[in-house]
């Protein structure tokens, strides 16, 4: 029972719409009506500016990061294969990612999983996050597309999990990669059409 409570709480924390709250509270803007219409960090930068964008990014990362430690804080007993699986920090963090992307508060239409996924990886393996960040910013430097950089970093995580034989990481990163591709479908189409806006700060 406690495991279910932990997973639901992880989802609800992940579903907290940081970008929407910051936009309405300080800018009187519903960011869903601007830019890409997304509530995540990238659109927050675009619509609300850098300071607000950094705050939203931090909050979205923190949502994923904190949930990784729930198995340590909740009185759960992993005495079987199933309970052990669902008390793994990556699995608990995945529920936060799902909450971020499909928030119950916003009719299941939220962010694109990037920042919250980064928070989960930070909590589980900071070195892995550093490697993925290097890949992300390298691709961003070359192509100037945040969407493309996010997808390539996620796929790199899948490849890395295969190399190190971490099959829970493989499952989670595989699910996140699929979600990322689905959520960035319109971005991918615009890239092929040459219509996707490029960043100008790098």
Curated annotation (Swiss-Prot):
The chain crosses the membrane at residues 2-22, 54-74, 81-101, 120-140, 162-182. It is found in: Cell membrane. Catalyzes the transfer of an acyl group from acyl-phosphate (acyl-PO(4)) to glycerol-3-phosphate (G3P) to form lysophosphatidic acid (LPA). This enzyme utilizes acyl-phosphate as fatty acyl donor, but not acyl-CoA or acyl-ACP. NCBIfam families: glycerol-3-phosphate 1-O-acyltransferase PlsY. Its EC number is 2.3.1.275. Belongs to the PlsY family. Probably interacts with PlsX. One of its GO terms (biological process) is phospholipid biosynthetic process. Keywords: Cell membrane, Lipid biosynthesis, Lipid metabolism, Membrane, Phospholipid biosynthesis, Phospholipid metabolism, Transferase, Transmembrane, Transmembrane helix. This is Glycerol-3-phosphate acyltransferase.
């Amino acid at each position: 029972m406690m495991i279910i409570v932990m997973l639901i709480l992880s989802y609800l924390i992940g579903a907290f719409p940081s970008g929407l709250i910051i936009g309405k509270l300080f800018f009187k803007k519903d960011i869903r009506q601007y830019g890409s219409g997304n509530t995540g960090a990238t659109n927050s930068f675009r619509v609300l500016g850098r300071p607000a964008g950094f705050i939203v990014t931090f909050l979205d990362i923190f949502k994923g990061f904190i949930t990784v430690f729930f198995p340590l804080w909740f009185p759960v007993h992993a005495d079987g294969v199933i309970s052990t699986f669902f008390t793994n920090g990556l699995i608990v963090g995945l529920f936060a990612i799902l909450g971020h992307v499909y928030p119950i508060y916003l009719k299941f239409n939220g962010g694109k999983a990037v920042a919250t996924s980064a928070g989960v990886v930070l909590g589980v393996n900071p070195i892995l996050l550093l490697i993925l960040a290097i890949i992300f910013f390298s691709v961003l430097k070359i192509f100037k597309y945040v969407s493309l950089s996010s997808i390539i970093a996620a796929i790199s995580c899948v490849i890395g999990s295969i190399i190190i034989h971490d099959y829970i990481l493989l499952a989670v990163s595989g699910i996140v990669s699929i979600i990322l591709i689905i959520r960035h479908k319109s971005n991918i189409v615009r890239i092929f059409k040459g219509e996707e806006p490029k960043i100008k700060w790098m």
